[in-house]
Amino acid sequence: MRHSGLRLPATAPAGAVLALVWLLLFASPGVAAPGQWVDPAAEARNLLIWSETTKDLVGKLGTGYPARLAAATVDYQRRRLEALRADPERQPNPNSCTLVLTCPIDPEVGIDRWRASGGLAEPVLFTSRSGATLSGTVWATADGPARRPGVVFANGSIVGFEQAYWFLAQALARAGYVVLTYDPQGEGMSDQFGEAPDQLEDAFAGTPLLGFVGPQSLTGALLNGTNRPVGDGLGLGGNGLPFYDGQIDALDFFLSAPDRPYLPRPSRSTGTNHSAKQQRRAAAGTARGYNPLWKLVDDSEIGLAGHSYGAQAASWNGQADHRVRAIVALDSLCLPGPPQDEMLAFATAPVNNILGVQLPALYGFPDRCFGSPNEPPPALTTPALHMTGDYLLAPVPYAQAPDPESKSHASQAYSKAGVDSAAIVLRGGNHIDFADSVGLIPSSLRGRDMATWYTTAWFDKYLRHSPTADAELTDPPWRNDSATAAVDPSGDANAYSYHYLSRLDITRADGTRYRCEDLRAGCA
């Protein structure tokens, strides 16, 4: 089998080289129709998109950026230690940010830099329903309308931390929003454990296998007294409650004010109310009694957003909570349903069925929400944007073309329910495209730009009711984007996946319907 004219740059990462070898050995060229062999040369170029941010970081080694990156990361750890010394009641350790290298801080999005440019950034601490202290930041601009829509953003799991999403929070603030970012329990600067008797209710923040001692497992049911049915989830995945319940706690805090100070809800496990801790800490100045930027928030125009496990939470909470008007789920939008274990959900997801073999967590997320509360699933009523990429967490090439609709099933379900939705699949993108990993974890260069653009446009339509939002969504720039072409291995200016269909189904402001099932090709 001959593949002529195929070359990788000398700086290509080892993963891309191994992927290319796999393709040359096992794939044969052909038309990329579902079930047929993909073009190995095209797939090799697509895989190179995966490593663009890492290549960009390597290109910055001769500049001052690495030193500023190191300084920002060290400063984060310094502030972390100072905060813990000043407030011994807090207990974030151990989590991923206990280790310096797993929480790199982008110097371009620091609070001091934001404030110097005219931005407002208010660090906040508040008590969750499990009694843990959660850490976050409220963002806005000094100039702008007196009342603005609000967005609450939830991190992803495992190595998620608030600073990885500050780029998006600042972009939304510049666009006219008030934004709350925060670390879910067990991540970043938030406590790992709750207050007795709910120490384990929201612990471990989605970390695989540690879910065995969380409330979704049989062990957790015994420890925490949860009422989940025996056998309902084996506890293989992490604990989803820090994301589902934590985002609602964060929303409650975001909508608090001096005349309605924040108080946590009763814990899910034991029904214990930890309001006394919140009131005590607020009185002592070690927690905020209410949102410090409350005057700016228009509580009738609220959106939820999140990445990874945070996107799962936003998908559920945005339907379950009547205060929410729009949802953005960055890898990945899910459909509410009966609770299911995280690891089992990935292992059985249709998108991960390759050549008739079920391979867990290879290419995408399951369609149904995992790790969700044991409650009746809410109906689909709130408009939702779904964004994902061609790949998930590893640059595994496609030997055969996948089902092109397999990453838009959730969006299609919204359409069947008569609710606006979109599914945007980034060409060559992966799970890290929606977080700021500063290139230490590879991702595409344009992924964050595309996520920022679509997130802003989606909220502009449903929260700000911008007169230009319909035109932005129905005539997007991403089919012919010069910046995408400039960094793309093949010079392709079209940022939409050719493996999977991207779609948009919305009602325009004038009441007419716009539906396009292939945004890469475009629709009239």
Describe the residue ranges of each PLM region.
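Alpha/beta-hydrolase-fold serine-hydrolase catalytic core, especially in secreted/extracellular enzymes
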Residues: 34-71, 427-431, 436-524
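N-terminal cap/lid segment of alpha/beta-hydrolase-fold proteins
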Residues: 81-146
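Short beta-to-alpha linker loops that shape the active-site pocket of alpha/beta-hydrolase fold enzymes
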Residues: 129, 183-187, 333, 429
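Short substrate-entry loop that stabilizes the transition state in hydrolases
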Residues: 144-148, 153-192, 336, 394-396
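Alpha/beta-hydrolase active-site loop
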Residues: 200-299
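Short glycine-enriched nucleophile-adjacent loop
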Residues: 255, 311-321
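Conserved alpha/beta-hydrolase "nucleophile elbow" surrounding the catalytic nucleophile
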Residues: 306-308
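The feature captures the conserved acid-bearing segment of alpha/beta-hydrolase catalytic domains
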Residues: 325-431
